[in-house]
A protein has these predicted regions:
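Active-site-proximal C-terminal subdomain of hydrolase catalytic domains
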Residues: 80-171
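Short, structured active-site "lid" loops
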Residues: 1
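Catalytic cores of nucleophile-dependent amide-cleaving enzymes
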Residues: 13-121
Length: 171
């Protein structure tokens, strides 16, 4: 059971992530459609994504591109830590940078492919350190990685963006 301590920033967790052509796309649960969100599709703020390649008919979902975060999301993240727990969340920094521009304090994600069981374990530890112990994101990422290590199948590591904050020790 995770409960935030008083004064602890909030966290947003996104499970499914895809990386392609130097962009990271966040999966939605909305099925891809030619009749919905036409402006967002035309401007490539929403793109079709799928979990696995398979032959037609296509049965994918909408994926949120970095421009969707910048122009279509309302409000600010007010220092929130955004956690991209799926594969490749920080393989490219375009989406992470968009969240920072919208006011997120930090973005945490994997630098490559990650198994479901490993990300579940790592993010559970990360949330414990962020919410139960009230650690800053940089320290929480370091502790979670010390607990679980890189993904045993893919070697990917949990990282924090922006790297300058991680290096300087700022939360």
């Amino acid at each position: 059971h995770l409960t935030p301590r008083p004064g602890v920033s909030s966290a947003v967790v996104e499970r499914a992530v895809a990386a392609l052509k130097e962009n990271v796309f966040l999966f939605t649960s909305d099925a891809d459609s030619d009749t919905q969100y036409l402006e967002e599709q035309t401007e490539l703020r929403l793109v079709p994504v799928d979990y696995v390649e398979h032959p037609p008919p296509y049965t994918g979902y909408f994926g949120i591109a970095s421009d969707f975060v910048r122009s279509s999301m309302r409000g600010k993240f007010d220092g929130t830590t955004v956690i991209l727990m799926g594969c490749d969340g920080l393989t490219f920094d375009t989406t992470a940078a968009a969240f920072i521009e919208k006011g997120a304090g930090a973005v945490v994600g994997w630098d490559g492919s990650v198994s479901a069981s490993h990300t579940d374990e790592a993010v559970e530890r990360l949330l414990h350190y962020l919410l139960d112990e009230g650690l800053a994101p940089r320290e929480a990422v370091a502790r979670a990685m010390a607990d679980v290590g890189p993904d045993p199948s893919y070697g990917s590591k949990l990282q924090m963006y922006p790297a300058e904050k991680a290096a300087s020790g700022a939360p």
